[in-house]
Amino acid sequence: MSTADLMLRWAIALLLAAAGVAAEDSCGKNEFQCRDGKCIVSKWVCDGSRECPDGSDESPETCMSVTCRSGEFSCGGRVSRCIPDSWRCDGRTDCENGSDELDCSPKTCSLDEFRCQDGKCISRQFVCDQDWDCLDGSDEAHCAATTCGPAHFRCNSSSCIPSLWACDGDRDCDDGSDEWPQNCGAEDTAAEVVSSPCSSLEFHCGSSECIHRSWVCDGAADCKDKSDEENCAVTTCRPDEFQCADGSCIHGSRQCDREHDCKDMSDELGCINVTQCDGPNKFKCHSGECISLDKVCNSARDCRDWSDEPIKECKTNECLDNNGGCSHICKDLKIGYECLCPSGFRLVDGHQCEDIDECQEPDTCSQLCVNLEGSFKCECRAGFHMDPHTRVCKAVGSIGFLLFTNRHEVRKMTLDRSEYTSLIPNLKNVVALDTEVANNRIYWSDLSQRKIYSAVMDQGTSLSYDAIISGDLHAPDGLAVDWIHGNIYWTDSVPGTVSVADTKGVRRRTLFREKGSRPRAIVVDPVHGFMYWTDWGTPAKIKKGGLNGVDIYSLVTEDIQWPNGITLDLPSGRLYWVDSKLHSISSIDVNGGGRKTILEDEKQLAHPFSLAIYEDKVYWTDVLNEAIFSANRLTGSDVNLVAKNLMSPEDIVLFHNVTQPRGVNWCEATVLPNGGCQYMCLPAPQISAHSPKFTCACPDGMLLAKDMRSCLPEVDTVPTTQGTSTIGPVVTTSAAVSLKRKEDPSATRHKEDPSATRHNEDPSATSTSRQPGDTPELSTVESVTVSSQVQGDMAGRGDEVQRHGVGFLSIFLPIALVALLVFGAILLWRNWRLRNINSINFDNPVYQKTTEDEIHICRSQDGYTYPSRQMVSLEDDVA
């Protein structure tokens, strides 16, 4: 390539770069330009959340010019934010200047409200509903005994449950009275226990087999004598199913799909897309007419083109010859024939039938789906039993209850609404929440105090709690507990970090940090070693990574705007999250496939904040509605109001032993305590059968030694600042202490999305020569830090340099481009002149070109995710 060509290419590249810079200087019609040049949607300006990285969309100068819409209240003052009118005089200060709580008239209850003894108002429909909606319980005082309907069973505690749930081996009443022997027939039950070889959770068939009790009356005969399907109630279909005229059920999506899925073809009756020629007694002529089927092959012309009287087809039964080529059913028609398939099969090529795998549809079963030839079977995981009436997998054991925050307290509500109490009162600004079921312990974060607390539940009046994380916290919006390994994980949206600590708060470490990210809610899967969190930064996304901070990448990057709460349904292996701007609840499997929108509703999902999954229900909190709702987690149907007037409900979790299954703590299963790690032992993601069970980690500012277990101080570090973090500098080590990284083969999965780049800040990425045990255990406060003042000065200088740099480029860049073009023209002229000079060249036969040999530079095909030196082997510990 000549010098002139090279210079021309440089000139073109600079011109394109200049055009790109100019394009970024302006935003669209419905966009707002941040001070740093970024464009956001105009309706996000002054909405209470910072979408601009520099916060200019929420600055006082910007918000002073905002005009509130109808149904909103203007705070006025220095920051004129808009809040819903419903927040006005609600007893909670929402405006920075407190104007929403000024000049409020004394609280009076309306005619449709009940006044509690403490002065608060609740809806009259909550009175005597067996639920304490007043904190003092006055709404449940002097109530008459509850009367249950004829199809319900009355518990000893006066609550009502469906009669089908009584004596089914599963405690549905909170006091277990639905399973008491005196209510189930003590003599008969005792006799059955003695003579029956089946357990209490099994059904004894008349043909002597034992089957699961939940299989009784499920529509499929499992006993040889079919005794499990005798004396059953009339079959009813699920809300997402269509009931055929013969009583059978098909998935609702198969109704009116132009295919007969019901045996009686009732699923295609009454459909809008049915034409006048559709149906078994209609025939459509080739010329367009529609005639009745009895006029076909009657030796009379009823179609203009005689297509109703073909000579060869009339009175010919094609099914007599090799069944017409049909694999199952051949139906002879007056003209031609058609192949049919039995229930549970579908026609694939006009002749062959194949089994329909109903289990490919995620909504087919509540939990487990077993595909059978021509049918399927729904089953439940351990700890659940299927309800024969609703086909829902119900948890075994005590009744579950919801725990949720409402800024100043943590409340507890049982799912049957028999108990509704204030669990932890008198809090400042509680947001994030999670539990440790086995130890009956609860954890929460307080944004005002900037601390993470822990307490034992149900302490009664003598409530006490501890601050386990009390330093280097800014906005701990998300919290999750690893109940197997005894760790807690939290997000901090200010520095954009995800951190981990033991449940005592003694050891902690930052696992993830990304400039511009805004991690919000987090959920963990300690059984498989993964964590997931929502990020409402730019771009918004959902991230996935190992619990030890490795293999982090973006799982969801499309059709997502403001992801808030996230939860994991372990039995189904699906993630659920709410999007506050899309007003939706969505789900996806843990590998990023099978995405589905469960529900979209601007009223009931006005501003969803958090959600929880239990059995077949999804529960979510809504800040604007000040309420908790529930719906079917598979279909989004059956939306119900669980609680209201909650004063900013935020995080919500479901407390039940089935939500936290037991697992192996490999850090404690080895001979060496703490897995042989000097500081922290963190579970590793189980990507394959060869993945390590755990890896060691060091506090921020320290590195793993060569033994990959002990910790050493970082050397030759260069502190840098990132964002507005004051937790500590992001440090880079010199080549002398760097560890060679292998290429991650899975990184190609996210080439289209820059945010999908995997991050690994595990200190195991570096090592130095040091003997284990030389360095004592260190806390995070001993790591290298940079003061807030120094970081602010550095950030200010950076902004100033950037402003001067932009002005300098605007002057220098055009001059440089013109100079390059002139220089390129001179080179082209000289090149043209040299070509016009005649010359004679003599090739030297001795000189041979030696640069034609190809040089191949190979790199390892192994992934970097788990270097061999990081793996901790149990056999090594035993040795």
Swiss-Prot record:
One record GO biological process: negative regulation of amyloid fibril formation
GO molecular function, one term: protease binding
Start and end residues of each stretch annotated as Clustered O-linked oligosaccharides: 717-788
Biased composition (Low complexity): 779-791
UniProt region (Disordered), positions on chain: 718-797
Residues annotated as glycosylated: 97, 156, 273, 657
Subunit structure comment from the entry: Interacts (via NPXY motif) with DAB2 (via PID domain); the interaction is impaired by tyrosine phosphorylation of the NPXY motif. Interacts (via NPXY motif) with LDLRAP1 (via PID domain). Interacts with ARRB1. Interacts with SNX17. Interacts with the full-length immature form of PCSK9 (via C-terminus). Interacts with PGRMC1 and TMEM97; the interaction increases LDL internalization.
Family, per entry: Belongs to the LDLR family.
Protein's UniProt name: Low-density lipoprotein receptor
Organism: Rattus norvegicus (Rat)
Name of the coding gene: Ldlr
